[in-house]
Amino acid sequence: MMEEFSYDHDFNTHFATDLDYLQHDQQQQQQQQHDQQHNQQQQPQPQPIQTQNLEHDHDQHTNDMSASSNASDSGPQRPKRTRAKGEALDVLKRKFEINPTPSLVERKKISDLIGMPEKNVRIWFQNRRAKLRKKQHGSNKDTIPSSQSRDIANDYDRGSTDNNLVTTTSTSSIFHDEDLTFFDRIPLNSNNNYYFFDICSITVGSWNRMKSGALQRRNFQSIKELRNLSPIKINNIMSNATDLMVLISKKNSEINYFFSAMANNTKILFRIFFPLSSVTNCSLTLETDDDIINSNNTSDKNNSNTNNDDDNDDNSNEDNDNSSEDKRNAKDNFGELKLTVTRSPTFAVYFLNNAPDEDPNLNNQWSICDDFSEGRQVNDAFVGGSNIPHTLKGLQKSLRFMNSLILDYKSSNEILPTINTAIPTAAVPQQNIAPPFLNTNSSATDSNPNTNLEDSLFFDHDLLSSSITNTNNGQGSNNGRQASKDDTLNLLDTTVNSNNNHNANNEENHLAQEHLSNDADIVANPNDHLLSLPTDSELPNTPDFLKNTNELTDEHRWI
């Protein structure tokens, strides 16, 4: 809303040219009124038509005066604007770069410096901030390209009376003409202890933190030498240039959110951090080239509407010439990373001391506190709570690396569940399986010297009995039977020695009554002769498979 001006106000010479049209109009109207009064004196009895014309002229004069002096009375006619020019405009731009929201005392100083009323200074700053928010909202993005920001700095002297503006983010505390973006563009390998990520917003439910400004290049050396996350170190890096920073600690494997705010003229640093091990799911969404084209088209349409609303042809041409510079490159693609966590994060706060006499390093530590988000949404955003993820928006390249870093950590540090190491026999090539009956030099204690003899492996008597029965029905030569008997005797010697050294002669007599299959039959079916684990700590003195057929009864069988 523009200020109501009176004609007898003594303006500064910088704005005299802006009011020439008002003074000229005033002189013409006064001359016309004087002529009408003179004609009225010459004609004492005017005709009714002339009186009607005089009243109409007087009403028209009153309407013109009201339309030109009261800008708050909105009507079909667009009100004229008062613009700052020359040195006054340069001063306003410099002050806006330093502080876009000056206080009443600061606006008064600016007013005295340029000879402009304080209300006009306040309106100029309001219109400049409103124009920035309008272009941010029109682009449907969280950032403003640097070239577009330079255009904003050039045309903010044009006033705006649009009351339908929607604010989507706070205004940056410091604006940089060379690079007005929200991206810090810190190399990922710039620090040996921390990874810095280009994040422009953090959202958890309806709680949202938008980034303003960017880290200054003169602080890159401090970033490179950062060794701890003390409040003073973090504040020195942010240095009133940005109010949001996200990093991951390599040593502690923690994700850290840092942001700042002002309350009662005191700067407050906030910190939210949680371990990577609490992240149970990552969901990365990347912006496509079609999204960039649509964003550029929206930006061009917004610039076109702004140019149509402006009554300055020179500035309109300037915006049209620079519209092609508003296109974002593919390297500036945006991304969105959603993190689902299994526990609540930790919250900390630090109040910066403004006392000049006190050393700030005396209390250089974070104070653990409760959740300071709206409705404690961040504290409850975990699996089993509200199940709401942490949504991070930022530079696509940076989010890609962050997603890969979390996944690599999870894959290398997660404790896998206990897996049964037993290998199915079908999966093992049969040529690599040595038949246990033929290895006369092997022992159950060879693979593990500490194995107790009582816990040594033994044969499955059911399988062996079946094999013996099948062998009795088959035909074999006497030489084959004798060779099989000799091999089995060697195996029995080892088995008997591992079972409390029983009498080998008795075992040979029992075995002589059995007819075993030859070696070829055993190798052909190795799966029928697998060993089984013991089920009892006390083994019988004489295994069943060593007994003759008559002794294999229920009275003699052991369980």
From Swiss-Prot:
One CC-aspect GO term: nucleus
Instruction: List every position bearing Phosphothreonine.
Output: T542
**What InterPro entries does the annotation carry?**
HD (IPR001356), Homeobox_CS (IPR017970), Homeobox_DNA-bind_prot (IPR051000), Homeodomain-like_sf (IPR009057)
Q: Where in the cell is it found?
A: Nucleus
Xref: Gene3D superfamilies: Homeodomain-like
Which intervals carry biased composition (Low complexity)? 24-52, 63-74, 293-307
Which keywords appear in this protein's UniProt record, sorted alphabetically?
Answer: DNA-binding, Homeobox, Nucleus, Phosphoprotein, Transcription, Transcription regulation
Q: Any idea which GO molecular function terms this record carries?
A: DNA-binding transcription activator activity, RNA polymerase II-specific; RNA polymerase II cis-regulatory region sequence-specific DNA binding; sequence-specific DNA binding
Q: Which domain of life is it from?
A: Eukaryota
Describe the function of this protein. Answer: Regulator in phosphate metabolism and acts as a derepressor of another central regulator PHO5. Binds to the upstream activator sequence (UAS) of PHO5. It also binds to the TRP4, HIS4, and CYC1 promoters.
Record protein name field? Regulatory protein PHO2
Q: Which organism is it from?
A: Saccharomyces cerevisiae (strain ATCC 204508 / S288c)
Mind giving the lineage of the organism this protein is from?
Answer: Eukaryota, Fungi, Dikarya, Ascomycota, Saccharomycotina
